[in-house]
Regions:
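All-alpha prenyltransferase/terpene-synthase fold signal
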Residues: 1-194
């Protein structure tokens, strides 16, 4: 799409913070209750649940601030910064990652039809990857056609990632996976594989 590294950096940092927020909250006992993340103790195991919740909350808020500051400082075109901030909040919110997590948590132990599983994946992983791809395009000044192509790519990549993650949860060893194998089934999560 073009663009300069100085333009990409605040966008990449904002997206990574949002992703980290989602992982911290996802590991909490009230969500997936995972004690391990990438082979290391999860945030709430190291710092306690309250601090993990607050760290996640802070990381959910910082991306908008980073993008706004990049627009104010001229690192990103101000209108592009507004568009990225709107997209960031849409993809993180009830129509994106948080909405997908609601579907996930509200349906533990229930057999879900394929279309609901795919919608959940689209809203969780797909929304984050769509944000990555489209925000980069917007920051670089790419047109609507490239943004649409990036969005379509992100959707397919998100679905592929989630299906691979489901397969690994059943077939991988704990060392490779970085968390206990079979944790989805153990917690009553219905996945594409199950």
């Amino acid at each position: 799409c073009g663009g300069e590294p100085e333009t990409a950096l605040p966008v990449a940092c904002a997206v990574e913070m949002l992703h980290t927020f989602s992982l911290i909250h996802d590991d909490l006992p009230c969500m997936d209750d995972d004690d391990m993340r990438r082979g290391r103790p999860s945030c709430h195991k190291v710092y306690g649940e309250a601090n993990a919740l607050l760290a996640g909350d802070a990381l959910a808020m910082l991306p908008s601030q980073i993008i706004a500051q990049a627009g104010i400082k001229g690192l990103i075109d101000p209108m592009a910064a507004l568009k990225i901030t709107a997209l960031l909040n849409e993809r993180a919110g009830i129509f994106g990652m948080i909405g997908g997590q609601v579907i996930d948590t509200e349906n533990e132990g229930k057999q879900l039809p394929e279309n609901i599983i795919l919608e959940m994946y689209r809203m969780k992983t797909g929304a984050l990857l769509d944000l990555c791809c489209r925000a980069g395009c917007i920051a670089a000044g790419a047109g609507a056609d490239k943004q649409l192509a990036a969005s379509e790519y992100a959707g397919k990549l998100g679905l592929a990632f989630q299906i691979i993650d489901d397969i690994l949860d059943v077939t991988a060893d704990e060392k490779l996976l970085g968390k206990p194998v079979g944790s989805d089934a153990e917690s009553g999560k219905y996945t594409y594989v199950s």
